Amino acid sequence: MDIRAAEISAILKDQIKNFGQEAEVSEVGQVLSVGDGIARVYGLDNVQAGEMVEFPGGIRGMALNLEADNVGVVIFGSDRDIKEGDTVKRTGAIVDVPVGPELLGRVVDALGNPIDGKGPINAKQRARVDVKAPGIIPRKSVHEPMSTGLKAIDALIPVGRGQRELVIGDRQTGKTAIILDTILNQKAIHDNGPEGDKLYCVYVAIGQKRSTVAQFVKVLEERGALQYSIIVAATASDPAPMQYLAPFAGCAMGEYFRDNGKHALIGYDDLSKQAVAYRQMSLLLRRPPGREAYPGDVFYLHSRLLERAAKLSDERGAGSLTALPVIETQGNDVSAFIPTNVISITDGQIFLETDLFYQGIRPAVNVGLSVSRVGSSAQIKAMKQVAGSIKGELAQYREMAAFAQFGSDLDAATQRLLNRGARLTELLKQPQFSPLKTEEQVAVIFAGVNGYLDKLPVSDVGKFEHGLLSYLRSEGKAVLDTIRTEKAISDDTKAKLKGAIDSFAKSFA
């Protein structure tokens, strides 16, 4: 048998030539124990707080507790396939998500993975979920209105671009409906408004039923509002770490628009469930519990999230991120731990009441307890002119109505006040999915505060409003256009508006 050494060495050299020389070095650790979505890992000595780690099978986790002899890792996914002794790898990256316009119209989970079955998202940029909020110098005071399309809010509790306005109330009082209507109200601007006025919307669903989220997405899709919205969903069946992370992920997506000179709105629905998820994680990580068993830094959890909503200065592109966090109360108790925390962080609250809801006053806004700490600087001049008196009149009405229950012989002035108040309360009612443009709201409230409703039966106020709007949209279009462009009611506009309402009132009678 003839062995040719030269030929064998040539073959070996040829084989070795294509052999990859780079060896991947990664720091690894071992799972000591796992359960309830928490893994204790030995090793990983140089891991950073908040760093992503990888378990076998591609499951991700985040290092939260860095202790002397082990690392506490929360698992983003099911811990069923992770067992003691498994190898855990560092990724070297702090938790980040895809951001950018490519996400518009999509439904994603807390890590930015699509869950709507519409294929992958080819985002060109990624951003860390937990970044520092802008400081004092890069900010500017809130001065542009963020129109919700709801009369009760835009007239009495105005929200500005860059503000944080809390929506608080018991379950089933219409909290989500306010956010939904606000998102739907942006459609008109997106269809034919200038780019600088467009408001991109992010909706974060935390711990909700999947059917509820699906319904929300369906409404947006049917009404053409999904194209400018991003939905981040961490539903009730998702692990607690995902529910904790979802608001931060949504915020990072909203910040992309804020930092690029655009305007965005983010609704967190709701932060009570995020606090519960964070409490669960903290207790399992054996962090010491505080009031109501929440960890000591639950205030910081919400403050660092909500401080990221801001109106940036002109040097920074004048973008904004407006936040509408939702908090669910138990039995109208606003003095519980989480509600008081979030009330103190935000720039005002819209307080919804079960009693008002069942009386048919919807949106069920308690005007007395609701405030906006930005106030009239977030309104156009026309709205300030008409809505200035309505808040005072309603406050007097509520006070008088309480006394009027006891006495029957009321003087004429009190009677007039009660009549006007009842009609204004009726005027502020609004069905769902029917947001109004600002100039239409101005016209309707103008009719209310100038006594056009005083002679009508309360039951006809809604009909009068509906008819007046139809009339103005067809016959009085010029007046509405003037209010929209001038953003104020001059004496000339006032006379024209009065004339239009007078001519409609004659035909209505």
Swiss-Prot record:
Keywords: ATP synthesis, ATP-binding, Cell inner membrane, Cell membrane, CF(1), Hydrogen ion transport, Ion transport, Membrane, Nucleotide-binding, Translocase, Transport
Keyword Cell inner membrane in record: yes
Cited Pfam families: ATP-synt_ab, ATP-synt_ab_C, ATP-synt_ab_N
EC number: 7.1.2.2
Binding site for ATP: 169-176
Enzyme class: translocase
Membrane topology annotation: Peripheral membrane protein
GO MF term set: ADP binding; ATP binding; proton-transporting ATP synthase activity, rotational mechanism
Superkingdom, natural source: Bacteria
UniProt-annotated location(s): Cell inner membrane
Recorded GO CC terms: plasma membrane; proton-transporting ATP synthase complex
InterPro entries in UniProt: ATP_synth_asu-like_sf, ATP_synth_asu_C, ATP_synth_asu_C_sf, ATP_synth_F1_a_nt-bd_dom, ATP_synth_F1_asu, ATPase_a/bsu_AS, ATPase_F1/V1/A1_a/bsu_N, ATPase_F1/V1/A1_a/bsu_N_sf
Site (described: Required for activity): 370
Reaction catalysis annotation: ATP + H2O + 4 H(+)(in) = ADP + phosphate + 5 H(+)(out)
Main location, first listed in the record: membrane
Similarity comment: Belongs to the ATPase alpha/beta chains family.
Subunit structure: F-type ATPases have 2 components, CF(1) - the catalytic core - and CF(0) - the membrane proton channel. CF(1) has five subunits: alpha(3), beta(3), gamma(1), delta(1), epsilon(1). CF(0) has three main subunits: a(1), b(2) and c(9-12). The alpha and beta chains form an alternating ring which encloses part of the gamma chain. CF(1) is attached to CF(0) by a central stalk formed by the gamma and epsilon chains, while a peripheral stalk is formed by the delta and b chains.
Function: Produces ATP from ADP in the presence of a proton gradient across the membrane. The alpha chain is a regulatory subunit.
Protein's UniProt name: ATP synthase subunit alpha
Organism the protein comes from: Rhizobium meliloti (strain 1021) (Ensifer meliloti)
Gene (UniProt): atpA
